[in-house]
Regions:
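Small-residue-biased structural context
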Residues: 1-163
Length: 163
């Protein structure tokens, strides 16, 4: 039987992988093959994680009135993260502008996952029962696999993104 710590530990495992990819990307330079490959891996990982997290965790938390505001906040940040990834993908990796944007993205994304882990997950756990946990664990793993198979890098400048 799944427990609160299991689903949240699983999400934190993904976050740790994301932190490692961010660190590796910060160590790359210019329009290198390493930067391109790591950015593609990060993009697919983040997009699939966000979609699975929304379908497993956040859809459950939206049904719990005390956590609705926190949940909406996180989902809105997921949208901002995807826009930033698309903007980075549309920016020349060899330009100084790319690294500047990436450093801002790195800071914002780390803030997002720290907030989830330190504030939201402990709060959410108070409102979840074993049935919720089992459902979320099952949905997350299935959706993560499916979403990762479909995820792609989609270049789109922020100023061109539809609101």
């Amino acid at each position: 039987m799944a427990t609160a710590t299991e689903i949240f530990e699983r999400l934190k495992q993904d976050h740790d992988k994301h932190r490692a990819l961010l660190d590796k990307l910060l160590d790359t330079s210019g329009d290198s093959n390493d930067r391109e490959a790591l950015f593609e891996e990060l993009t697919k990982e983040l997009k699939s994680h966000a979609a699975a997290e929304e379908q497993a965790l956040y859809s459950t938390m939206l049904r719990k009135p005390p956590t609705t505001d926190e949940t909406r906040h996180s989902v809105a940040e997921h949208h901002e993260i995807e826009e930033a990834l698309n903007d980075l993908a549309a920016t020349d990796m060899s330009s100084g502008g790319w690294l500047t944007k990436f450093k801002t993205f790195d800071h914002d994304y780390r803030h997002h996952i720290d907030e989830e882990e330190e504030d939201h997950f402990p709060d959410f756990a108070k409102y979840l029962d074993d049935k919720d946990m089992e459902h979320m664990e099952r949905v997350f793993e299935r959706r993560k696999r499916e979403e990762k198979a479909e995820a792609e890098v989609t270049p789109e400048k922020k100023e061109d993104a539809k609101e």
